Amino acid sequence: MSKPLQPATAASTPKTAIRVGDVRYDINVSKIPYLSSFVDFQANAQPQSTDFIHEPIPLFDIALKGIESGYRQCFRSLPADLSQHHILCDTYHFLHVDILCGQSIGEIISDLKSGAGDYDREERREIKGDRSKARDTAFKLLYLILLGDFTDEAKDSTKIFNAVLYLVSHAATFKWRTRSVVRAAYEERFVVSTKQKAALDKWEKKDPAKLAVEDAGDVTTEEEEPYYFDSDYSI
């Protein structure tokens, strides 16, 4: 009697060996539409060949890490240099990776806030926040700011500002590199009023020693530890 088929797991997901530049990767190309099409084209053009070789792609190693382990890894893998994040977002665009998954600005803000833990007074239990989701969403916000198309830039810029302000005001969740790069992206894309700048400056930490300690401690990868509401600002 044959055994029933088991659902596919991450471990059993087929991967394709591809050399990008000088580096060989084993990749689940279903997550990267451009490479999926590239492999299909090469396989049809050269049926006997099992070697897939692509020219170098800028910051591909970091882009792949973000796809496989969560976009929060992108902030951890790059310096707080907006130009590098521009390159990375352009690479995701080139690879046709759907970073935003059709999410609206409101949905992105909601996911940013998902990192906040809470306390259920009726059941007397703590409700853990999902830091991983919130930190991954911070990169989605960055991508939206850098490459997003806005139908009403004046109206949407206010919504984006609220998201950025929430992010920079929650240092327990969003570490220094994230806060620095997302703020820089907003200030590059939109006109920042004096009032908005003052609101952002209120939450800026400038002590180099403390920032270095914070940056060095941003190493969690799988289960990010829970936290609870840490500022007096919310949107």
Predicted segment positions?
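Alpha-helical protein-protein interaction/assembly modules
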Residues: R76-C89, D98-I235
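Low-complexity, intrinsically disordered flanking regions
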Residues: M1-K3, T220
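Canonical BTB/POZ domain core
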Residues: K3-L5, A10-S114
